[in-house]
Amino acid sequence: MKKQVVEVLVEGGKATPGPPLGPAIGPLGLNVKQVVDKINEATKEFAGMQVPVKIIVDPVTKQFEIEVGVPPTSQLIKKELGLEKGSGEPKHNIVGNLTMEQVIKIAKMKRNQMLALTLKAAAKEVIGTALSMGVTVEGKDPREVQREIDEGVYDELFEKAEKE
């Protein structure tokens, strides 16, 4: 029998046996508390953020493994800036400002899940998300910063980040 995969979105470090987890894994005959404990241990560094988690179960042996994904880019931006939520009116209401270093940090976290081939392209994706949330970058309109990236203004930062 092949393994079954259950995918859920849980709050980092705070998974509970209730929905969405309990109903999803209960029918598989697993010890729900054991699964919850393992998920909480694996996601504690993402406290306060919604984290995608895959539970891979062997229905015969009842063995399971946990794969923790990276939270959505918007969640990482909110955590970096200490925001509760993004702007309801991103064109008119600015809720925060990211530095280029913060953009690069988030891009490095998300890079494996992005279609971007370079760190620069990944950073531009993060900046696009910031734009839709009402977050400026380096105190400027995110579109302006994307143009500056294309012009090579931040090349030194990217080269340094690539080496880390």
Swiss-Prot record:
GO terms for biological process: translation. Part of the ribosomal stalk of the 50S ribosomal subunit. Interacts with L10 and the large rRNA to form the base of the stalk. L10 forms an elongated spine to which L12 dimers bind in a sequential fashion forming a multimeric L10(L12)X complex. The gene is rpl11. GO terms for molecular function: large ribosomal subunit rRNA binding; structural constituent of ribosome. It comes from the Archaea. The keyword RNA-binding applies. GO terms for cellular component: large ribosomal subunit. Keywords: Ribonucleoprotein, Ribosomal protein, RNA-binding, rRNA-binding. HAMAP family: Ribosomal_uL11. Transmembrane segments: none annotated. Forms part of the ribosomal stalk which helps the ribosome interact with GTP-bound translation factors. SMART domains: RL11 (SM00649). This is Large ribosomal subunit protein uL11. It holds the Pfam family Ribosomal_L11. Belongs to the universal ribosomal protein uL11 family. Gene3D superfamilies: Ribosomal protein L11, C-terminal domain, Ribosomal protein L11/L12, N-terminal domain. InterPro entries: Ribosomal_uL11 (IPR000911), Ribosomal_uL11_C (IPR020783), Ribosomal_uL11_C_sf (IPR036769), Ribosomal_uL11_CS (IPR020785), Ribosomal_uL11_N (IPR020784), Ribosomal_uL11_N_sf (IPR036796).
